[in-house]
Amino acid sequence: MVGLRIAPPLALRRPTRLVQRNLLVYRRSFMVIFSGFFEPLFYLFSMGFGVGALIGDVPLGDGRSVPYAVFVAPALLASSAMNGAIYETSNNFFYKLKYAKLYDAIIATPMSLQDVARGEVMWALMRGSLYSIGFLGVVGLLALAGLGLISSPLGWLAFPAATVVGYAFAGAGMAATTFVRKWRDFDFMQLAIMPMFLFSGTFYPIDAYPAAVQTFVQLTPLYRGVHLIRACTTGSLDATLLIDLAYLVALGTIGLAITSRRLGKLLLS
Protein backbone atom coordinates (compact mmCIF):
# COMPACT_ATOMS: atom_id res chain seq x y z
CA MET A 1 0.00 0.00 0.00
CA VAL A 2 1.41 3.35 -1.05
CA GLY A 3 1.28 6.06 1.61
CA LEU A 4 0.03 9.49 0.64
CA ARG A 5 2.23 12.49 1.38
CA ILE A 6 0.30 15.72 1.68
CA ALA A 7 2.43 18.62 0.48
CA PRO A 8 1.89 22.08 1.95
CA PRO A 9 0.37 24.69 -0.36
CA LEU A 10 2.80 26.54 -2.61
CA ALA A 11 2.17 29.80 -0.75
CA LEU A 12 3.78 28.19 2.32
CA ARG A 13 6.20 25.75 0.68
CA ARG A 14 8.42 28.35 -0.94
CA PRO A 15 8.67 30.70 2.07
CA THR A 16 9.48 27.65 4.20
CA ARG A 17 12.61 27.13 2.08
CA LEU A 18 13.85 30.52 3.23
CA VAL A 19 13.19 29.54 6.84
CA GLN A 20 15.19 26.35 6.28
CA ARG A 21 18.03 28.40 4.82
CA ASN A 22 18.11 30.62 7.92
CA LEU A 23 18.10 27.57 10.19
CA LEU A 24 21.13 26.20 8.33
CA VAL A 25 22.95 29.52 8.75
CA TYR A 26 22.31 29.56 12.51
CA ARG A 27 22.85 25.85 13.14
CA ARG A 28 26.33 26.39 14.66
CA SER A 29 25.48 29.57 16.55
CA PHE A 30 21.91 28.98 17.57
CA MET A 31 22.35 30.64 20.96
CA VAL A 32 22.82 33.97 19.17
CA ILE A 33 19.10 33.86 18.45
CA PHE A 34 18.38 34.04 22.18
CA SER A 35 20.50 37.17 22.70
CA GLY A 36 17.49 39.48 23.03
CA PHE A 37 15.61 37.11 25.31
CA PHE A 38 17.58 38.06 28.40
CA GLU A 39 16.74 41.78 28.49
CA PRO A 40 13.05 41.38 29.45
CA LEU A 41 14.02 38.56 31.79
CA PHE A 42 16.41 40.86 33.66
CA TYR A 43 13.66 43.48 33.86
CA LEU A 44 11.34 40.84 35.33
CA PHE A 45 13.73 40.05 38.17
CA SER A 46 14.87 43.62 38.82
CA MET A 47 11.54 45.43 38.42
CA GLY A 48 8.97 42.70 38.98
CA PHE A 49 10.49 41.25 42.13
CA GLY A 50 12.92 43.97 43.23
CA VAL A 51 10.80 47.10 42.84
CA GLY A 52 7.65 45.01 43.29
CA ALA A 53 8.64 44.26 46.87
CA LEU A 54 8.41 48.00 47.57
CA ILE A 55 5.26 48.74 45.58
CA GLY A 56 2.81 46.01 46.56
CA ASP A 57 -0.35 45.38 44.57
CA VAL A 58 -1.32 47.19 41.36
CA PRO A 59 -4.96 47.74 40.29
CA LEU A 60 -6.25 46.25 37.06
CA GLY A 61 -8.89 47.86 34.90
CA ASP A 62 -11.64 45.54 36.22
CA GLY A 63 -11.28 46.66 39.83
CA ARG A 64 -9.05 43.79 41.00
CA SER A 65 -5.51 44.20 42.26
CA VAL A 66 -2.56 41.89 41.60
CA PRO A 67 1.04 41.77 42.86
CA TYR A 68 3.38 43.98 40.88
CA ALA A 69 5.31 41.04 39.41
CA VAL A 70 2.04 39.55 38.11
CA PHE A 71 1.26 42.92 36.51
CA VAL A 72 4.67 43.30 34.87
CA ALA A 73 5.28 39.73 33.66
CA PRO A 74 2.77 39.68 30.75
CA ALA A 75 4.00 43.06 29.55
CA LEU A 76 7.55 41.75 29.47
CA LEU A 77 6.35 38.68 27.56
CA ALA A 78 4.89 41.03 24.94
CA SER A 79 8.19 42.93 24.88
CA SER A 80 10.08 39.67 24.45
CA ALA A 81 7.98 38.75 21.41
CA MET A 82 8.53 42.25 20.04
CA ASN A 83 12.29 42.04 20.53
CA GLY A 84 12.60 38.72 18.74
CA ALA A 85 10.66 39.96 15.74
CA ILE A 86 12.35 43.37 15.55
CA TYR A 87 15.90 42.04 15.90
CA GLU A 88 15.40 39.73 12.96
CA THR A 89 13.57 42.17 10.67
CA SER A 90 15.84 45.15 11.29
CA ASN A 91 19.62 44.68 11.27
CA ASN A 92 19.65 41.10 9.99
CA PHE A 93 17.14 41.78 7.23
CA PHE A 94 18.96 44.98 6.22
CA TYR A 95 22.30 43.18 5.96
CA LYS A 96 20.85 40.45 3.77
CA LEU A 97 19.11 43.02 1.60
CA LYS A 98 21.82 45.66 1.16
CA TYR A 99 25.16 43.88 1.65
CA ALA A 100 24.83 40.12 1.26
CA LYS A 101 22.52 40.65 -1.75
CA LEU A 102 20.76 37.46 -0.70
CA TYR A 103 17.40 38.39 -2.15
CA ASP A 104 18.88 39.32 -5.53
CA ALA A 105 19.92 35.68 -5.81
CA ILE A 106 16.68 34.28 -4.41
CA ILE A 107 14.40 36.05 -6.87
CA ALA A 108 16.38 34.43 -9.70
CA THR A 109 14.73 31.18 -8.53
CA PRO A 110 10.99 30.40 -8.75
CA MET A 111 10.50 32.25 -5.45
CA SER A 112 8.63 35.54 -5.74
CA LEU A 113 9.03 38.76 -3.76
CA GLN A 114 5.94 37.79 -1.79
CA ASP A 115 7.61 34.47 -0.93
CA VAL A 116 10.67 36.34 0.34
CA ALA A 117 8.55 38.62 2.52
CA ARG A 118 6.49 35.72 3.87
CA GLY A 119 9.59 33.64 4.54
CA GLU A 120 11.33 36.37 6.51
CA VAL A 121 8.18 37.10 8.51
CA MET A 122 7.86 33.38 9.28
CA TRP A 123 11.49 33.31 10.41
CA ALA A 124 11.08 36.43 12.56
CA LEU A 125 7.90 34.94 14.00
CA MET A 126 9.82 31.78 14.86
CA ARG A 127 12.47 33.83 16.66
CA GLY A 128 9.86 35.82 18.55
CA SER A 129 8.08 32.58 19.50
CA LEU A 130 11.34 31.13 20.83
CA TYR A 131 11.74 34.21 23.03
CA SER A 132 8.18 33.75 24.28
CA ILE A 133 8.70 30.05 24.98
CA GLY A 134 11.88 30.80 26.91
CA PHE A 135 10.19 33.53 28.93
CA LEU A 136 7.18 31.33 29.71
CA GLY A 137 9.56 28.53 30.68
CA VAL A 138 11.12 30.79 33.30
CA VAL A 139 7.65 31.79 34.50
CA GLY A 140 6.80 28.10 34.83
CA LEU A 141 9.92 27.43 36.90
CA LEU A 142 9.05 30.36 39.15
CA ALA A 143 5.57 28.89 39.61
CA LEU A 144 7.13 25.63 40.78
CA ALA A 145 9.11 27.67 43.29
CA GLY A 146 5.90 29.22 44.62
CA LEU A 147 6.25 32.51 42.72
CA GLY A 148 3.30 32.16 40.36
CA LEU A 149 3.01 35.03 37.86
CA ILE A 150 -0.09 33.78 36.05
CA SER A 151 -3.29 34.17 38.05
CA SER A 152 -5.77 32.66 35.58
CA PRO A 153 -6.35 29.14 34.19
CA LEU A 154 -6.54 30.84 30.78
CA GLY A 155 -2.88 31.80 31.07
CA TRP A 156 -1.97 29.30 28.34
CA LEU A 157 -3.53 31.75 25.87
CA ALA A 158 -0.55 34.03 26.51
CA PHE A 159 1.60 32.08 24.05
CA PRO A 160 -0.69 32.39 21.00
CA ALA A 161 -1.27 36.01 21.99
CA ALA A 162 2.49 36.59 22.05
CA THR A 163 2.70 34.97 18.61
CA VAL A 164 0.23 37.52 17.28
CA VAL A 165 2.36 40.29 18.81
CA GLY A 166 5.42 38.85 17.09
CA TYR A 167 3.59 38.77 13.75
CA ALA A 168 2.60 42.42 14.07
CA PHE A 169 6.13 43.60 14.82
CA ALA A 170 7.68 41.30 12.22
CA GLY A 171 5.57 42.81 9.45
CA ALA A 172 5.94 46.38 10.70
CA GLY A 173 9.67 46.04 11.38
CA MET A 174 10.46 44.60 7.99
CA ALA A 175 8.39 47.25 6.21
CA ALA A 176 10.24 49.99 8.12
CA THR A 177 13.61 48.44 7.28
CA THR A 178 12.93 48.66 3.55
CA PHE A 179 13.09 52.45 3.95
CA VAL A 180 16.43 52.37 5.80
CA ARG A 181 19.37 53.68 3.75
CA LYS A 182 22.29 53.41 6.20
CA TRP A 183 23.03 51.67 9.48
CA ARG A 184 22.64 54.87 11.47
CA ASP A 185 19.02 55.11 10.32
CA PHE A 186 18.21 52.35 12.79
CA ASP A 187 18.62 54.94 15.53
CA PHE A 188 15.26 56.33 14.42
CA MET A 189 13.69 52.89 14.83
CA GLN A 190 15.05 52.72 18.37
CA LEU A 191 13.44 56.10 19.03
CA ALA A 192 10.12 54.34 18.49
CA ILE A 193 10.89 51.01 20.16
CA MET A 194 12.34 52.24 23.46
CA PRO A 195 9.53 54.71 24.33
CA MET A 196 6.97 52.03 23.49
CA PHE A 197 8.72 49.63 25.83
CA LEU A 198 8.82 52.15 28.67
CA PHE A 199 5.45 53.87 28.35
CA SER A 200 2.96 51.33 26.89
CA GLY A 201 1.63 50.19 30.24
CA THR A 202 4.61 47.91 30.72
CA PHE A 203 5.57 48.98 34.23
CA TYR A 204 2.50 50.86 35.46
CA PRO A 205 -1.14 51.44 34.42
CA ILE A 206 -1.64 54.11 31.78
CA ASP A 207 -4.18 55.74 34.11
CA ALA A 208 -1.19 57.71 35.37
CA TYR A 209 -1.26 59.73 32.11
CA PRO A 210 -3.57 62.58 31.13
CA ALA A 211 -6.53 61.51 28.98
CA ALA A 212 -4.96 62.72 25.72
CA VAL A 213 -1.74 60.81 26.39
CA GLN A 214 -3.72 57.68 27.28
CA THR A 215 -5.45 57.83 23.90
CA PHE A 216 -2.10 58.16 22.12
CA VAL A 217 -0.59 55.25 24.05
CA GLN A 218 -3.58 53.05 23.21
CA LEU A 219 -2.78 53.53 19.52
CA THR A 220 0.66 51.95 19.85
CA PRO A 221 1.13 48.28 18.91
CA LEU A 222 2.99 47.30 22.06
CA TYR A 223 0.19 48.61 24.27
CA ARG A 224 -2.25 46.44 22.31
CA GLY A 225 0.03 43.46 22.81
CA VAL A 226 0.50 44.17 26.52
CA HIS A 227 -3.25 44.60 27.02
CA LEU A 228 -3.98 41.35 25.18
CA ILE A 229 -1.44 39.18 27.02
CA ARG A 230 -2.17 40.72 30.43
CA ALA A 231 -5.85 39.92 29.94
CA CYS A 232 -4.93 36.29 29.25
CA THR A 233 -2.70 35.88 32.30
CA THR A 234 -5.05 37.65 34.72
CA GLY A 235 -8.35 36.38 33.31
CA SER A 236 -9.62 39.87 32.43
CA LEU A 237 -11.21 38.80 29.14
CA ASP A 238 -13.68 41.12 27.42
CA ALA A 239 -14.75 42.27 23.96
CA THR A 240 -11.97 44.87 23.72
CA LEU A 241 -9.50 42.04 23.12
CA LEU A 242 -11.01 41.64 19.65
CA ILE A 243 -9.80 45.18 18.93
CA ASP A 244 -6.31 44.19 20.08
CA LEU A 245 -6.31 41.11 17.83
CA ALA A 246 -7.66 42.99 14.82
CA TYR A 247 -5.13 45.79 15.29
CA LEU A 248 -2.14 43.47 15.57
CA VAL A 249 -3.13 41.18 12.69
CA ALA A 250 -3.85 44.19 10.47
CA LEU A 251 -0.50 45.78 11.33
CA GLY A 252 1.43 42.63 10.46
CA THR A 253 -0.52 42.06 7.24
CA ILE A 254 -0.15 45.67 6.07
CA GLY A 255 3.56 45.54 6.88
CA LEU A 256 3.89 42.35 4.85
CA ALA A 257 2.15 43.96 1.86
CA ILE A 258 4.33 47.08 2.07
CA THR A 259 7.46 44.93 2.26
CA SER A 260 6.51 43.02 -0.89
CA ARG A 261 6.00 46.26 -2.81
CA ARG A 262 9.16 47.86 -1.48
CA LEU A 263 11.25 44.80 -2.34
CA GLY A 264 9.96 45.05 -5.88
CA LYS A 265 11.12 48.65 -6.07
CA LEU A 266 14.50 47.93 -4.45
CA LEU A 267 15.37 44.73 -6.29
CA LEU A 268 13.70 45.05 -9.67
CA SER A 269 14.19 48.72 -10.50
Range-by-range predicted roles:
Residues 2-39:
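Aromatic- and glycine-rich beta-strand/loop motifs that create alpha-glucan
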Residues 12, 16, 20, 27, ...:
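Alpha-helical membrane-protein architecture signal
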Residues 25-97, 128, 147-158, 208, ...:
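Transmembrane helix-boundary elements of multi-pass transport/secretion proteins
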Residues 42-47, 68-142, 191-197:
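Hydrophobic alpha-helical transmembrane segments of multi-pass membrane transport proteins
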Residues 52-53, 79, 95, 109, ...:
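Transmembrane helix-loop junction
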Residues 113-190, 236-260:
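Alpha-helical transmembrane segments and their short interhelical loops
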